[in-house]
Design a protein with these regions (language model features):
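Aromatic- and carboxylate-lined catalytic core of secreted/periplasmic carbohydrate-active enzymes
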Residues: 333-413, 421-434, 499, 503-528, ...
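Active-site clefts of carbohydrate-active enzymes
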Residues: 105-109, 205-221, 291-327, 348-367, ...
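Catalytic-core region of carbohydrate-active enzymes that cleave or remodel glycosidic bonds
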Residues: 124-125, 234-249, 266-352, 369, ...
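N-terminal carbohydrate-binding accessory modules
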Residues: 1-54, 68-71, 378, 389-390
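A short, well-structured beta->alpha microelement
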Residues: 255-264, 425-445
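Aromatic-lined substrate-binding rim segments of carbohydrate-active enzymes
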Residues: 36-107, 116-121, 126-128, 234-244, ...
Length: 661
């Protein structure tokens, strides 16, 4: 089991991952306390017969029963894992094994990631387990499932312990050796930063803290401190694994919080061998889930996906089993857009769970009857072998969306997240232009897109801004929507003026505006929250979209944060206008109209073009398109809220593999 820059491989051949999570149908997460190889053999045999090609497992509870107080695992623990791995090997199933869940605080210490004593015990546990199995070729290690940085799970808040406080101050001293300058950045009196600097308070994470005398400018620094500290922990654990002689894959299994405000693959991705996302709740942003988790030059896996039970107020399920399966189909299909596939959570439903949205999750019920999603997984598994032989050398799309962490790691994060999501949908669903995402701290790995879009950034670090301008200097085209006149501490920067434009930022305090695209006028409307917090740009000549040469490239600058206007079509029209100006066209032509809720996303491979199609529409859609690269036509009926995949061979100029039609 290995990875290249984009996909998983087994024995050097690409692997389209269609897997599941498995512990035990009998005792679920207590499978190390009550191991039953007879049941494992039966269940894994069923998973194998379903055609699935990877399983994820590990420890979510009960660590005190696996090892002593120093982290040394008991012999029975290692023998249990050996039996499990041998059973998986019998059925040819690669295994991802997870060590910790949420917070590795089970081995003591005052801080799970920063306390040297705690980290040492974690290393002891991991080292002993990996040493025993370092030569198992089909095994990968997951350091921790869905990590949070502190005991305040699923948030980015300080733990508040002395070790964290000391580490925070050490980090600040290295990053900002001049306390007077730091005080200016945070807009506080210099004397308030004398001595030990406190951790941010809860009020500082509120956008309204300034009304009670507490500004939020330290939040960005605290989040960066947490990101870098966790990335260092992941590097330490990966190095511990490598010391054993293991060359097995190492990862972190993060959920959607990682691409929002928690520990992000944009930071810890360089510490592991592939990145992950767990696509659970963001059902309207399934594509964004994948694009934001994918890091340049590194494979990405939707390592958990499934169906949280959605309930009405009267505790009755909102979705039928068939509708749930259709949603899962869209998630699995979309996982092959710039991703390696998906692992479903979970094969056997866990009736031991107490939360009503967790208990029913899984393909096989406790009475061993199957949900429709089990059939769905079998169908994807049958398709995977014909897909994976084509998963080689994917070309990046010509358009990159650069996301602003300066905004995302502020108390106004919701605006930047919404701008990203709406930019992805406007480009891919409406303008029919495929794109990829690059986070602000990864800007040096941007690549060579023909167009970079900065969607409603409001703020950007000086380093990232310089990199974007350099990209334009060397011949790239940049589209900015709204101002980018603030840095990560919300200090004013005169970036438009520095580019030779007569312009300034001003508060966006109106509901209606117009954007002029050539001879057309696009109406925009901004809601209450946008009027309360956002800025727009004002050009002295009154224009609303400027086009200007810069170096060898060009800049298009719209004065409004278009992605955050109420009507998404306005962003799509702006994107199409700029793309047309620089001769970027959709990679397929529409032979018949497509509903706005249908995604068609092509990826050019070395020998083929991979098309993923997903419907968010309430009506069936007649897909009738022609691929521009091969001239091949695709014509079929896509059922409402379902997905389909087609592989068009470059030599054959026809569909050579398909799913869903």
């Amino acid at each position: 089991l290995s990875v290249n820059h984009d996909y998983f491989e087994t024995d050097g051949h690409p692997l389209a991952v269609v897997g599941t999570t498995y512990m035990s149908s009998e005792v679920q997460r207590l499978f190390f306390e009550h191991p039953n190889v007879f049941m494992w053999n039966q269940d894994l045999g069923q998973i194998h017969d379903a055609g699935l090609n990877m399983i994820r497992t590990g420890w979510w509870t009960g660590w005190d029963k696996f090892c002593d107080e120093n982290g040394q695992p008991y012999e029975r623990t290692l023998r249990t894992l050996e039996a499990y791995l041998m059973t998986a090997r019998k059925y040819g199933l690669p295994v991802q094994f997870n060590f910790f869940a949420f917070l590795p605080d089970v081995l003591g210490g005052n801080n799970a990631f920063l306390d040297p004593a705690a980290v040492r015990r974690q290393q002891t546990l991991i080292s002993a387990v990996v040493s025993r199995f370092h030569d198992v070729p089909f095994l990968a290690w997951d350091l921790i499932n869905e990590p949070s940085f502190s005991q305040h799970l699923w948030t980015m808040r300080p733990n508040g312990d002395p070790i964290e406080l000391a580490a925070w101050n050490e980090w600040l001293d290295k990053r900002y050796p001049d306390r007077v300058k730091l005080a200016a950045m945070w807009n506080v009196p210099p004397q308030s930063l004398a001595g030990t600097i406190s951790l941010p308070s809860e009020m500082e994470f509120s956008p309204r803290g300034m009304y009670v005398g507490v500004n939020s400018l330290r939040v960005n620094d605290y989040i960066l401190f947490a990101q870098e500290s966790f990335a260092q922990w992941a590097r330490t654990m990966r190095a511990t694994i490598r010391v054993t002689g293991s060359q097995q894959l190492v990862t972190v299994g993060q959920d959607e919080g990682g691409i929002q405000d928690r520990l992000s693959p944009a930071f810890w991705g360089s510490s592991v061998d592939f990145t992950t996302n767990h696509s659970w709740w963001q059902n309207d942003y399934i594509l964004w889930d994948s694009l934001a988790a994918k890091q340049p030059g590194e494979a990405m896996l939707i390592q958990e996906t499934g169906l949280q039970r959605e309930l009405n107020l009267n505790e009755i399920a909102r979705r039928t089993p068939e509708n749930e399966a259709a949603l899962l189909e869209r998630k699995v299909a979309t996982s092959f857009i710039q991703g390696s596939g998906a692992i479903e959570w979970l094969w056997n439903t866990n009736s031991d769970m107490t939360e009503s949205n967790e208990t029913p999750i899984g393909a096989v019920r406790t009475d061993y009857t199957e949900k429709p999603e089990a059939t769905l997984l079998r169908e994807f598994a049958r398709f995977a072998p014909s897909l994976q032989e084509h998963l080689r050398d994917p070309q990046l799309p010509p358009i990159a969306i650069v996301t602003s962490q300066a905004s995302q790691y502020s108390v106004l994060a919701d605006f930047q997240l919404e701008a990203q999501r709406r930019a992805v949908r406007a480009l891919t669903y409406l303008a029919r232009l495929p794109a990829y995402l690059v986070a602000e701290n990864q800007i040096q790995r941007l690549g060579n897109p023909r167009l970079v879009i900065l969607p409603s950034p409001q703020a950007l670090s000086d380093t990232a801004w310089a990199a974007v301008v350099k990209y334009v200097d060397t011949g790239g085209t940049l589209l900015i929507t709204g101002p980018v006149e603030r840095d990560e501490h919300w200090q004013i920067r005169h970036r438009a003026v520095e580019l030779g434009l007569k312009a300034h930022a001003e508060p966006l305090v109106y509901h209606n505006a117009e954007l002029k695209l050539g001879e057309r006028r696009i109406s925009l409307a901004f809601g209450q929250q946008q009027q309360s917090w956002l800025d727009s740009l004002h050009f002295d000549d009154g224009s609303t979209l400027r086009e200007m040469p810069h170096g060898k490239g060009r800049i298009y600058w719209a004065v409004y944060p278009v992605e955050l206007a109420e009507e998404l079509q306005s962003a799509a029209e702006l994107y199409s206008y700029v793309a047309t100006r620089i001769d970027i066209a959709p990679p397929f032509s529409l032979l018949a109209p497509l509903p706005a809720g249908v995604l068609v996303f092509p990826t050019v491979m070395s020998d083929s073009v991979l098309y993923v199609m997903s419907s968010d529409s309430d009506e069936d859609a007649a897909i009738n398109i022609r691929d521009q690269a091969t001239g091949a036509a695709l014509a079929f009926r896509l059922p409402a809220q379902h997905a389909a995949i087609a592989v068009i061979g470059k030599k054959e100029r026809r569909v050579v593999a398909k799913y869903g039609f």
